[in-house]
Structure formats: C-alpha cells, structure tokens
From Swiss-Prot:
It comes from Talaromyces stipitatus (strain ATCC 10500 / CBS 375.48 / QM 6759 / NRRL 1006) (Penicillium stipitatum). It catalyses: 2-[(1R,8S,14R,15R)-11-hydroxy-14,15-bis[(6E)-oct-6-en-1-yl]-3,5,9-trioxo-4,10-dioxatetracyclo[9.4.0.0(2,6).0(8,12)]pentadeca-2(6),12-dien-8-yl]acetate + 3 2-oxoglutarate + 3 O2 = phomoidride A + 3 succinate + 3 CO2 + H2O. Phomoidrides A and B (also known as CP-225,917 and CP-263,114) are potent inhibitors of Ras farnesyltransferase and squalene synthase. CP-225,917 and CP-263,114 inhibit Ras farnesyl transferase from rat brain with IC(50) values of 6 uM and 20 uoM, respectively. CP-225,917 inhibits squalene synthase with an IC(50) value of 43 uM and CP-263,114 with an IC(50) of 160 uM. Belongs to the asaB hydroxylase/desaturase family. Its EC number is 1.-.-.-. This is Alpha-ketoglutarate-dependent dioxygenase tstK. Alpha-ketoglutarate-dependent dioxygenase; part of the gene cluster that mediates the biosynthesis of the antihypercholesterolemic agents phomoidrides which are dimeric anhydrides. Within the pathway, tstK is responsible for the iterative oxidation necessary to convert prephomoidride to phomoidride A. The pathway begins with the highly reducing polyketide synthase tstiA that catalyzes the formation of a C12-fatty acyl-ACP, starting from one acetate and 5 malonate units. The hydrolase tstM is involved in the release of the C12-fatty acyl chain from phiA. Keywords: Oxidoreductase. InterPro entries: AsaB-like.
C-alpha cells in the first residue's frame, strides 16, 4: 500500500512470541524485550488519529491527542534539569486540563534521539534513547512500587489509594518523519493478550515489571502521521482504581514506516506522570 497519503498504512509491529515449551520467559534477558528473542512480527493496519481526535479519549479508549505549545526551545530539551523544572509543569497542566485531575506529579522522562536503544547485555542495562519497537505496556501491577510508589513516598501513596493513575505524555521535538509512535486502544486489547515480564536485580529485588503483548487481530491501532511538535499524545499505563477498565492500560510501540528508513531520526520527549483524582 502506498504511504504517500499516510491514511491507513499496513506496517509490521514487533509482538511477543511465547516459549514453545510453555516455560515463562526470562525477562532479565534484554534480548527478549529489546532484541530478537521471543519475537513475533505481525502486519497491522494503522488508523489516523486526527480525524477521530474528538472521539478517541483517555476515559473510553486509553489515549488522546491534544494540542500543546511548549515554552521550551528545541535546545532546552538537552537540559534534563530544565525539563524537570519547566516542562514537567507544562505536562502536568496539560494532563490536568485533559482529565480534570486534582494533582499531577511528573516523575521521569525519556528524550529519544537515536535510531535504537543502546543495550549492554553483560550489565543488563538499556539506555532508552531510541524508539522502543516491542509492543508493550510500561507498568504491570507488580511494577507500580518501582515505577512510582517508591518515588512518591508511602505517606502520599497511602492517602490516595484507589485514586491514582499513571499517564504518559509523548510529543516529538521535530515533525516525525520516521519511526512514529503507534498506540492500540485499551478495549481492543484483552487481558489475555498481556504477558508480564518482570526483571530482577542481582540481589533478587524487583527492578521492573511490565507487559509484553501477544498478537491479536482485534487490536485497533492509531498513529498521528507526520506528528508535529505541538501535537501531544496522552495515554494511560496503569490505574489504582479497583474498578479500572481495559482503557486504563494501553499497548504502544515505535515502528518502522516503510519508505522512511532513511529520513531524519525521530526526536521525542516522553514524560510519565502520577495523576491523582
């Protein structure tokens, strides 16, 4: 299918493939999350989010496209402290406006400016400076302590139990020409498609727990063709609400857009936020 009009291209996404013998995957093996192990390549059709901008919402679908003009310059995003002191406040206000939340605390970010993540297999480390191409959800329930609760503190977390979410914001620093972001609606991805991958430190303590995703033809994928710096994607990653829905965690990934492999490398900023209701 031609990609010049960017309407509904068919692309290949990197899903999870279970071990053939039924044994659980070793999530400490970074090749499983970032490399070629346990890899299932599947063709999916992408839907342009812009025409459905007013219909696709965080509440019902788990993602939302909003307009956001930042006061940050392009160069400012090279300064981690300025991102924390200025851009975090902008993101917090944008999420408040979109959700009606009482309070938003931004707690970490990734600026991606290379073609792929850097892996150090021997040290079990990854630098998140390139697109994450595996279909995933950032946080599984067992990972919430490491992801947010440890940072926010026991006193705060006890006071907001059942009233908080993790929401990510994502926007490009330049118009996206390659390796865009794709997000699947939460209701189209049932729980049985999620595979928990939990990593541990050498001392046995939990490092992170996230979901990888099995292919399912029911998944409904969206993207924003040639996404501009003033177009911000918000998407849910976890909810502590006991009545949480499928829209409270959405699968997402970067992907290769056929014909755009030699375009300018994508530069983007993603901020993760604790959202309190």
């Amino acid at each position: 299918m031609p990609h010049s009009n960017y309407e509904t291209p068919e692309v290949i996404l990197q899903y999870f493939a279970p071990n053939q013998d039924g044994t659980p995957p070793d999530a400490n093996d970074l090749e499983i999350q970032y490399g070629t192990k346990n890899l299932h390549l599947a063709a999916v059709t992408l839907n342009d989010l812009r025409p459905d901008k007013d219909k696709i919402t965080l509440t019902d679908h788990g993602l939302q496209l909003i307009n956001h003009d930042t006061a940050m310059s392009y160069e400012d995003f090279n300064d981690p402290e300025k991102i924390k002191s200025q851009y975090y406040l902008e993101v917090a206000e944008a999420i408040k406006k979109a959700t009606g939340a009482q309070k938003v605390i931004c707690f970490n970010h990734n600026v991606r400016s290379e073609a792929a993540p850097r892996l150090d297999i021997s040290k079990h480390k990854v630098d998140h400076i390139g697109p994450m191409r595996r279909v995933h959800v950032d946080v599984a329930p067992r990972g919430t302590y490491e992801a947010v609760e440890k940072r926010a503190g026991e006193a705060l977390m006890s006071s907001i139990r059942g009233r908080w979410k993790i929401i990510n914001s994502w926007k490009p620093l330049k118009t996206v020409q390659r390796d865009p972001l794709a997000i699947a609606t939460g209701p189209s991805c049932p729980d049985e498609d999620l595979v928990e991958l939990t990593r541990y430190r050498p001392d046995g303590s939990l490092s992170e727990s996230r979901y990888s995703v099995l292919y399912d033809q029911r998944h409904k994928w969206y993207w924003v063709p040639m996404q501009k710096p003033n177009e911000m994607l918000l998407f849910n990653q976890y909810s502590d609400d006991p009545n949480r829905t499928l829209a409270d965690r959405v699968a997402h990934c970067g992907f290769t857009l056929p014909g755009a492999e030699d375009k300018e490398i994508r530069e983007s900023v993603e901020v993760r936020a604790l959202v309190i209701y």
